[in-house]
Design a protein with these regions (language model features):
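N-terminal membrane-anchoring alpha-helices
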Residues: 1-56
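Non-catalytic C-terminal accessory region of glycerolipid acyltransferases
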Residues: 126-247
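Glycine-rich helix-loop-beta junction characteristic of Rossmann-like nucleotide cofactor-binding loops
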Residues: 60-64
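Catalytic core of membrane glycerolipid acyltransferases/transacylases, capturing the structured
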Residues: 19-29, 34-37, 50, 65-122
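Conserved acidic
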Residues: 2, 6, 35, 39, ...
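A secondary-structure boundary/capping signal
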Residues: 59, 73-75, 96-97, 145-147, ...
């Protein structure tokens, strides 16, 4: 096990407790505040610094121009949302899997800072759609992983429709984004943490103005194509820099 593992999780738990306490002290209904966004960004920075993750991001201009928007990304690691929460210049809410909300400390903290719980076993997604619509109307952006799970080998899988249904319903842009490197720092299904570099690339926004739910499949495939293209470029760039093949 890497020496970074225990210090990283210790720092993460302490930062989570601190944010949960601060949000609770501020009282109910404050998850929408700019102060909460700053606390979340600080929380993510603590995790990344402890893990030794060095993050670079391209395409920030696409994000600033599109907000509020739905950011959709490939999913390599549990570290991915932490990277996005720290690196993106957005008031960001994450569509997070139900299992994360069941973890001691993390679940209550996620709810307090306004993250949206997604239960794949539930047949009724209306509550998710309503929460997402409220956040977008309030000026927040959403981060979603259309693959629905992390990829064990970095290969980008098929996309589900949920994020695209939400974007069209609220008539906000989709911003495709690719991430690479997190699977080496915190491999999926494992707890060991290793220092490393992470690259993120945001592509041009896909507008949804005038689109209907009949356009979901086309929008989904356009986003997936953009993410796959951006991801290939990230893999090539990081491989050439390290002099070895990245995957």
């Amino acid at each position: 096990m890497s020496w970074r593992t225990v210090p990283t999780f210790a720092a993460g738990v302490l930062a989570t407790l601190a944010v949960a306490l601060l949000v609770r002290c501020r009282g109910p209904g404050r998850a929408d505040s700019a102060a909460t966004d700053r606390m979340v960004r600080w929380w993510a920075a603590v995790w990344l610094r402890a893990a030794g993750a060095r993050v670079a991001i391209d395409g920030l201009e696409h994000l600033r121009a599109a907000a509020p928007c739905v950011v959709v990304s490939n999913h390599q690691s549990n570290l991915d949302p932490i990277v996005y929460l720290q690196a993106l210049p957005l008031s960001l809410r994450v569509l997070a899997m139900h299992d994360l909300f069941r973890i001691w400390v993390f679940g209550p903290a996620l709810r307090m800072i306004g993250m949206i719980e997604v239960d794949r076993e539930s047949p009724d997604f209306r509550q998710i759609d309503q929460a997402a619509a409220r956040d977008l109307a309030a000026g927040h952006s959403l981060l979603a992983y259309p693959e629905g799970t992390t990829s064990p080998d970095g290969t980008i899988g098929g996309f589900k429709d949920g994020a695209f249904i939400i974007a069209i319903a609220s008539q906000v842009p989709i911003v495709p984004a690719a991430i690479h490197g997190t699977c080496r720092i915190w491999p999926p299904g494992r707890s060991a943490i290793h220092a490393g570099r992470v690259r993120v690339a945001a592509a041009s926004p896909l507008q949804t103005t005038g689109l209907t739910q009949h356009d979901v499949a086309r929008l989904r495939e356009l986003a997936r194509d953009a993410i796959c293209s951006a991801h290939r470029e990230l893999v090539t760039a990081m491989s050439s820099r390290t002099g070895r093949r990245a995957h």
